[in-house]
Amino acid sequence: MGYFSSSVVLLVAISSAFEFGPVAGRDLAIRDNSIWDQKEPAVRDRSFQFVPSVGIQNSKSLNKTCCLNGGTCILGSFCACPPSFYGRNCEHDVRKEHCGSILHGTWLPKKCSLCRCWHGQLHCLPQTFLPGCDGHVMDQDLKASGTPCQTPSVTTTFMLAGACLFLDMKV
């Protein structure tokens, strides 16, 4: 955790002890009846209290070496990464994770099922899509290499394309 100067610590202690707060018609006053009139109500909200910075900084404005890909630097050494990035410095992009030679997000028929490369893993649907599979899926845990055992017919290709479009609408 960062260190605060003695003047900052003193200011926080004084503001807490005397409960400084904004007063209607004035910039800053001590909450004491001798300083402001009872006719002017005090506008006191806890959100106006002095709160020291916790060190959350935008990497674009201060520390460009802390976080990559638009991440937000926290306490000088941790990053809050935007969607699809991860790692200590937001250096990894999940959209670029492929399944071997298959690109991320690609759909392909694989041994009676329809599979998709997603975040570096090949995920296969449990339904059968190819003819000749007798209602069951063979080998769901497939590797990304290789080719399908048979070439799908035109009807099957259109059915697969429709399923892909339907599933892409859900994601």
From Swiss-Prot:
Expressed at low level in specific organs of the adult animal such as spleen, heart, lung and brain. During gastrulation, expressed in the forming mesoderm. In later stages of the developing heart, expression is restricted to the truncus arteriosus. One of its GO terms (molecular function) is growth factor activity. Pfam families: CFC. Glycans are attached at N63. It is found in: Cell membrane; Secreted. Residues 135-171 form a propeptide. The keyword Glycoprotein applies. Disulfide bonds join C66-C73, C67-C79, C81-C90, C99-C117, C112-C133, C115-C124. It is a lipid-anchor; GPI-anchor. The keyword Ribosomal protein does not apply. Belongs to the EGF-CFC (Cripto-1/FRL1/Cryptic) family. This is Teratocarcinoma-derived growth factor. It comes from Mus musculus. The gene is Cripto.
